[in-house]
Amino acid sequence: MTHEEILAMLGDYVDYLIANSSAEAPMWNIEKVRSGKPNKWNYIDGCMITACLSLYKTTGDEKYLRFSKNFIDWFVQEDGSIKTYDPKEYNLDNVNQGKNLFTLYDIFGDEKYRKAIETIRSQLATQPRTKEGNFWHKDIYPWQVWLDGTYMAQPFYMEYETRFNKMQGCIDSYKQFMNIKKHMRDEKTGLYYHGYDESRQMYWADPVTGCSPN
């Protein structure tokens, strides 16, 4: 199979996904669809809409932009509230989808996206933290730092701080990354452990390092 044939096949697959997906029933999260449970604002959709917006930027094909906008608009209300999203859950996973709001705001200039950005930023303003200052991964996971939580929250955090807050939170973000390096990096391999429990109370936490087994 040639490079061109592979690209064509991938393009057909993506087109099939978006043609058969909606915010209420995204085909890429088929387990959720089959469960019969209503879809919620979540990080999986965030990853896929980021991919669709990247395809729009790369190809210029409006179908990717239309799909992304329609998907996000199902959740984002005119007042900036986000259907099914509660900032007080303090779940870093839910921040990930917020990255797409910056792109849609840049393209369309609709203030509801700007307001929704503030809605998500309000979560980080009061997100519980470890004693050293890192965001808890979730309120239901106290004192825990997870690598994927860093991916979920920090890009949005830095985008916001750079655009709208005169970079005031950049040092805070840097310190959080340095704490991760300090506690979660294996000096022998250079690889990182997935989780860290500052309290050492979780069953998986090493009693000395606080890190997960892997």
Question: Over which residues does each language-model region extend?
Answer:
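Solvent-exposed loop and edge beta-strand segments that line ligand/cofactor-binding
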Residues: 2-6, 17-47, 76-96, 137-150, ...
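Alpha-helical scaffold segments in carbohydrate-active enzymes
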Residues: 12, 16, 54, 74-77, ...
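Extended ligand-binding clefts on enzyme/binding-domain cores
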Residues: 147-214
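Extracytoplasmic mature domains of secreted/periplasmic and thylakoid-lumen proteins
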Residues: 80, 87, 92-152
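Low-complexity, Ser/Thr/Pro/Gly-enriched N-terminal "stalk/linker" regions
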Residues: 1-76, 111-119, 123, 127, ...
